[in-house]
């Protein structure tokens, strides 16, 4: 069982004595910067030259510097830019300013675990990862609550790495809900597996296949969309609220019986075997190498997939149906910038 830390376990004063730099101002970056600022921490934001986020950050009352300037000034540096850009930014703008005793933080362990970023031995390296999107991290903080999170230490040069991580987690509100102790290896590998096999890859493939089966059988695309994609949120929300048992308690007996007797025929032992293969590819670094090489080549495979998926009939049908749903338009407006990639 994981060790869980709360407000009482975290000394925010430890962070208030230091200067913090948030590198990036996207979904997580804006939430971290604003929550830390409101917790009384000395925060600055580091952005690339010409970043569109500069005006947003300054409009929120934050001090904006270049990544290099922010890294030079700060004692604690949180890297919140995309995985594929971290190595270059780190090598060119952060590493030259990592003097002894500083702390380097990440919200995802990819580049540390797969040795793309190689910090010097005399700095602390740790992970603080809220388990929710940035707008929720911010909203919960403002409401006096918090999002559960993860904390991990990769390198403890000062003897205070975990304490700094817990202080940071408290500053953004996570220790209000609880912060689970983990490792860079566990966070990285389970996060990638969840994305690929279940949350993104698995769910998207299941939805698309279900849609295609119904349309190929002669049913209207609109009906197929409702049954295989739109209503998925209803089921996921129930699982989110109370697990599989609550979902099954909340649906009809017909749906529950079909769940038990037909679900394992769709996602069966063969699917589980493929999941194991995917996990091994992650553990062995094969996926990381593939993704790194893809980005070094300019992302041609990703571009082909994006174009092909955008042209799938489910997208056109979905757009027409979502235009009928005013609450979806309102939700998208509420969760827009700064929540972009």
From Swiss-Prot:
InterPro entries: 6-PGluconate_DH-like_C_sf, KARI, KARI_C, KARI_N, KARI_prok, NAD(P)-bd_dom_sf. NADP(+) binds at residues 25-28, 51, 53, 83-86, 134. It is an enzyme of class 1 (oxidoreductase). The keyword Transit peptide does not apply. The keyword Repeat does not apply. It catalyses: (2R)-2,3-dihydroxy-3-methylbutanoate + NADP(+) = (2S)-2-acetolactate + NADPH + H(+); (2R,3R)-2,3-dihydroxy-3-methylpentanoate + NADP(+) = (S)-2-ethyl-2-hydroxy-3-oxobutanoate + NADPH + H(+). This is Ketol-acid reductoisomerase (NADP(+)). It comes from Anaeromyxobacter sp. (strain K). The gene is ilvC.
